[in-house]
């Protein structure tokens, strides 16, 4: 049975049993700062389980795409080397929100496995939590499973909880027995880690709420959360022991072999590539782009790990993006969003491949040289240099070291990273601790109507932990029952301001969401003392709020203007709105032309001058979308949404704060347009007084340039062009002089050539020359010395440039490429080329003299 058939049978089975089929949510979870990626089927229903959201159904079924690579759930280092580890996988799940409980959950699972999937009953085992007599009774007396195949587990493996506090409950897991020919013991035994018994389905019974003291309280409406890995059940149905042998992976592994030229389909690198194309393609489909932090950096790590495994197979050209078509063929029908994003996915992956190719070979040279010097442990400073200079994620370096039988000095790397962070830390912005545990009332937001409101302190956090009070100088997070402070969301920065009480003043530096409707006010107690329960006056910084409103409303106008000028393919891919500026990322396949930027800028300013009323209204999500309101990337919307419109020009779903009339914005200037990834552009802009100040600064700079050029401002461009023409002429003359200088140096250097076994060998450094002159000088030496080996080096901008040449009569024994690599490794580089001529670069100029001295010995050893 194919993977696609299993997926569809699962959805159909539960739909016939009253479940609503809910599409997979994106891999970027909405409104959950504790998660990098969606890593289980229940993630999109988390607020339902917590009682913070209500759906129009009480039974649901889904096939959820998931990623585990980064954060708490990180399987990356095992992927490709084990039978069942993946970065991307599909979780089949059925859910009950206060409807059916243990009995139906167990009976549904048993019926599906033994009915539509036709798995023999005697191949299935079950586990229950040791104290869960109710579940055990259902298995024994209703399912009629043999008592010998029911195991009670006393460990936490069979008791699930969402966090230290909150919903939790016992589990019942279902295992498949591959038979006695496979090593391993049943669940709960000492050799349970073997491959004979494989867990295929986990049924979680959420029946308790754990309070801060650890005590369990029965939930009024117990719920069910189940999860079955599609890849695992497919392996069972297709009678294979490794997930990489199922139909879905066979197609991708064969495709990876095709594009890399690898013949051995069991090669682990092919498994890595096949796994990683799924994770990368779906992450990009869901709006993640390669970057240097957060989700973007995890994507970059996965991408570069796949590229390196291709390099390991001998594929030096871009290849990874070629697998997207094969992936769409396999999974596009189940996930039409992947098919729709195919061109964008290919473009993003290809760009990242090209970017990494620029440093991969040189980085590998540094790594190989370091591994050759060190026995088992790669020093932390080398790991950091590979990360910082060559773009090698630390786990990629660890992968390579492990393949060589060694490891990395992670502590040394972290020390280097800490030193870099200390150097870079300038802003000192307070950052909310991720994952603050909170159980209590939500925060009531009043910030649309007022900037000041009376409130009471519900909870205080200091250094990530709950405290009863804080004192002057303490950095803390304050949760209020009511607040006018806007919490960071939808790209808009959180408000700043102060909390005033009779006993202290708390300076709020930032406001962020701890949970969907719980606001954390982060900052420092400037004076006095605050205690849980204190009455405070919450006062938002009015200047920062209004400036942020200018920028947020301008962002809406910008979005609409881009769609009008560039086309309706433009969609928001990310944004940042604060008091100082706005940044807007959008889908577009090419850089904007100067005239397009001006058109967009003019259109936004025209809408500002029209002074539209900025209207807001609440309506049903479906109705808002029908009326043309744009839903934004990365946002999670409830059934009722807030719609912000400016005349008939812009209508968006938005929970942010805005001006009352578009004319309040005053003035809009685009200050930068750039690319952030393939198919994604970024505009940075200013509004109001900041835009005016920027314009005046530009005028001042133009006047300064004009003064230097001794020209009127309107003549500055022509005068500058004339100056540049003169500079180019001077540069040509310098090149001629350099060639003459090199010729003079070569006349004296040629006498330094030594003879080794009848061959003239010359290795020398030249001063004040560029690569072109090096090449010309090399050709001159080869012509004059006849049968010879020549290596020339020079230092420019603190970097080494090398070139090697071997006359044609010697290339059967001596290769210029081998020679240049030998020399380059000594100066921190790597190179390559033809047998008769090769080039390289390096980063250790002080090693150049010694490296050149070693050439004669290399020639003698290789003759």
UniProtKB/Swiss-Prot annotation:
Location relative to the cell: Cytoplasm
Concerning InterPro entries, the annotation shows: aa-tRNA-synth_II/BPL/LPL (IPR045864), Ala-tRNA-lgiase_IIc (IPR002318), Ala-tRNA-ligase_IIc_anticod-bd (IPR018162), Ala-tRNA-synth_IIc_core (IPR018165), Ala-tRNA-synth_IIc_N (IPR018164), Ala-tRNA_ligase (IPR050058), Ala_tRNA_ligase_euk/bac (IPR023033), DHHA1_dom (IPR003156)
One GO MF term attached to the UniProt entry: ATP binding
Q: Which residues bind Zn(2+)?
A: 552, 556, 654, 658
Q: Which keywords, in A-to-Z order, does the entry hold?
A: Aminoacyl-tRNA synthetase, ATP-binding, Cytoplasm, Ligase, Metal-binding, Nucleotide-binding, Protein biosynthesis, RNA-binding, tRNA-binding, Zinc
How are cofactors bound according to the entry's free-text note? Binds 1 zinc ion per subunit.
List, in alphabetical order, the GO biological process terms annotated in this UniProt record: alanyl-tRNA aminoacylation; negative regulation of DNA-templated transcription
**What enzyme class is recorded for this protein?**
ligase
Kindly state which reaction or reactions the protein catalyses: tRNA(Ala) + L-alanine + ATP = L-alanyl-tRNA(Ala) + AMP + diphosphate
Enzyme Commission code: 6.1.1.7
Record Pfam families: DHHA1, tRNA-synt_2c, tRNA_SAD
Q: Which domain of life is it from?
A: Bacteria
State its cofactor. Zn(2+)
Q: Which GO terms describe its cellular component?
A: cytosol
The UniProt similarity line reads:
Belongs to the class-II aminoacyl-tRNA synthetase family.
Q: What is known of its domains?
A: Consists of three domains; the N-terminal catalytic domain, the editing domain and the C-terminal C-Ala domain. The editing domain removes incorrectly charged amino acids, while the C-Ala domain, along with tRNA(Ala), serves as a bridge to cooperatively bring together the editing and aminoacylation centers thus stimulating deacylation of misacylated tRNAs.
| Reported function | Catalyzes the attachment of alanine to tRNA(Ala) in a two-step reaction: alanine is first activated by ATP to form Ala-AMP and then transferred to the acceptor end of tRNA(Ala). Also edits incorrectly charged Ser-tRNA(Ala) and Gly-tRNA(Ala) via its editing domain.
PANTHER family listed in its UniProt record: ALANINE--TRNA LIGASE, CYTOPLASMIC, ALANYL-TRNA SYNTHETASE
The name under which this protein is listed is: Alanine--tRNA ligase
Which species is the source of this protein? Nitrosomonas eutropha (strain DSM 101675 / C91 / Nm57)
Record gene name: alaS
